[in-house]
Each structure stands twice: as C-alpha cells, then as structure tokens.
Design a protein with these regions (language model features):
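Hydrophobic alpha-helical transmembrane segments of membrane transport and translocation systems
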Residues: 234-236, 240-347
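Positions that flank functional sites
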Residues: 27, 110, 214, 241, ...
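Transmembrane alpha-helix detector for multi-pass membrane proteins
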Residues: 144-163, 175-253, 258-259, 264-270, ...
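Cytosolic regulatory modules rich in charged/polar residues
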Residues: 1-185, 294-322, 331-347
Length: 347
C-alpha cells in the first residue's frame, strides 16, 4: 500500500493531498488508506466514505473488492457504483476532480468514489489524444455498450414477431439460413451466448497466451462446428460474435459484466413479448439507472441532474470538448474551487 500511495504522490506533489490511514479487519488488521485533496473534496464526503466502510466489522480484508462490496449502497444492482482502476494517473485525475480514492493493503486496485455511468465509458487516453480522435472513440464505446445487451433481444423480437419491418430479401436470407435447424431461435441464441460466456470464463482461468487463444479460436471452432451440424444458423453465430465484440469495447470490466447479465433478461423478454417486451426491458433498465446513486450523486450524470452540473459536465460526456473548453471541474468538487483552467474559458 505504501508503494501505491507513493505512485500517486509522485504524480500529485501537493501538500493539500491528504492520506488518512485506518485499520480494517477484526483479526487481519489490514491497512486502508483514504486519499483526498483537502480543498477540493466536498464537506462530508470523506466522513460518508468512512461510515460506509465502518458499517460492518469482518475478520479480514483480503482485497479491495471486499471494501467495494461494503461501500456500495445498492448491493442488488447489476451496475457497479464504485469505480476501480490500476492506473495511478486515473487515480490522480479523480483526486483533482474532488473525489476520494481508497487503497487497500496487498491489492493493486484503487477504489474511486463517487462515480457515474459516464466514468465507466471514459479512458485516461481520451485526455491524451486530440479531441476528434477521443470523441470518435468514446462515441463508438457508447454505441457498443448499447448494442452489447440489445442486439440478441432485438433480433429475436424482429424475426419472431415483426418480420414485416424487414426487407423481403433479408427475410428470405434469414429463412434459408435456418433451414435444417431443429431448435427454436430462442434456444439457438441461448446456446451460443452461453457457449461464448463459458469460453470467456475458461480463458480467464487458463494461463497467459493460452487463455486469449482459447477465447478467440475456441469461439470460431465451436461456432463453425455448430453451423456444420445444423444446430444453429450462421446468422446467430455472427450476431453472438458481434455482441461479444461490442462488450470488449467497454473499458470497465465490471460495467461490461453488468450488460452481460442484463443481455439475458432482454433476450427472454423479447422472446416472450416481442418488440413490446424489448421496450419494457429497456424502460426497466433506464428507470433503475435513473434511481441509482453513488454517494448521493445521480448515477446517470451528466445526462440527468443538469441543475447540479450547470451544463458544463456535458462537455465531457459522449463528445469530449477541447481541453481549453473543459475549464470547470466536475460537480464532485467544491464550488469555490471549481475552476481548473486559467485563461479565457470562451476561447
């Protein structure tokens, strides 16, 4: 933990950076550091973080993931309410935004809170690249995140209930691709989705390069074998592979995993009620996101809660404005220290 703290202090050489060390674990007595910038963090945020961490007493804190579960308010939500990172520059940028960073002994992962959905689709490289390149990459991530859990359900809804909205050549192509397949389309999609999830989990457990190989080559081999055996149609294999590719474009593994879970709920609702069920599932997910909060801040900021952001946080959302326009810190920082760029903000 001292090394991790030193990595942050090397990048943020300010006397206003404070590190509060506490002990966690009734028997393990693990060291936990709470870092924040004194004049940027809002009053009460550090105390709220400590209160959440002290809400339960356990024997041992083996990793920062244990602290993360105790610090989350809505444990039943599939979406992560805290941001994690292994990069010191990401932690420093979060501190300069008025957020709190929590480090745990024997863990390379830092916990950042509060956080919003927008933070899970941003990367540190977005601020190191030019505006056009960063905005294009970020736009692709947003589209990929949406498609990663909606494509299979939309396919089932359209092909089972609403084929009239498709062009006739496309309908015939779908029909010819399914000739000889003994299973309904729902079973086909579930079989391939579960196979890809199994390959992904197996790739994590296997060592090194072998794990990456089994995830890619294994998917191709199983998909081709399933098509040759007339178990699934080629359209379903392409659809599932493209959906998996979209999930890989999401920077945060925890955030991508939430979409992987919700994907099956959307599939079942779409197969049951068609396009109506597809829309119901999207509305339920949207309502849940709208109600979710992280340390009191709306999870969907800056898309909701514009009265809190003043319209400035929207400049660093789907499109990243030039750095000279990002003169204001996010809403997490104190109002009197909101300005982070000296110069003409209208330049």
């Amino acid at each position: 933990i001292k090394i991790n703290t030193a990595l942050i202090r090397r990048r943020l050489r300010s006397t206003r950076l404070k590190c509060k060390e506490v002990k966690k674990g009734l028997r393990g007595h693990s060291n936990v550091d709470i870092l924040y910038v004194r004049d940027l963090v809002k009053p009460g945020l550090v105390e709220e973080v400590e209160k959440n961490l002290d809400s339960y007493v356990i024997d041992h804190v083996g990793d920062s993931g244990v602290l993360e579960q105790f610090a989350e308010a809505k444990w039943y939500s599939p979406f992560p309410q805290l941001q994690t990172t292994k990069r010191p520059d990401v932690a420093v940028n979060a501190l300069l935004e008025g957020r709190v960073v929590v480090l745990c002994d024997n863990s390379p992962i830092a916990i950042i809170l509060p956080t919003t959905m927008n933070n899970f689709l941003k990367t540190a490289d977005d601020y190191y690249n030019r505006t056009i390149a960063a905005s294009f990459a970020r736009l692709i991530r947003y589209v990929a995140a949406f498609m990663s859990f909606t494509l299979p359900g939309l396919y089932l809804a359209v092909t089972n209930f609403h084929t009239q909205i498709l062009p006739t050549p496309l309908i015939l192509a779908f029909y010819e691709a399914r000739l000889g397949c003994p299973f309904p389309q729902l079973i086909e999609v579930l079989m391939m989705e579960l196979s890809f999830e199994l390959l992904r989990e197996a790739g994590i457990r296997l060592p090194g390069a072998m794990g990456n190989t089994i995830g890619i080559v294994g998917g191709l081999i199983i998909g081709q074998a399933a098509v040759d055996a007339n178990l699934v149609s080629p359209i379903v294999v392409i659809l599932v592979a493209f959906t998996a590719l979209c999930s890989f474009a999401i920077p945060s593994e925890e955030f991508a995993f939430s979409f992987r879970i919700l994907k099956f709920a959307v599939i079942m609702m779409s197969a049951w009620l068609g396009y109506f069920g597809f829309l119901i599932s999207l509305m339920v997910i949207l309502l849940h996101l709208a109600k979710l909060k992280s340390c009191g801040y709306p999870y969907m900021m800056p898309f909701v809660g514009s009265e809190l952001t003043g319209g400035e946080d929207e400049k660093d959302s789907i499109i990243r404005f030039p750095l000279r326009r990002l003169w204001r810190r996010p809403v997490f920082a104190r109002e009197k220290e909101c300005r982070k760029l000296k110069g003409n903000k209208d330049d």
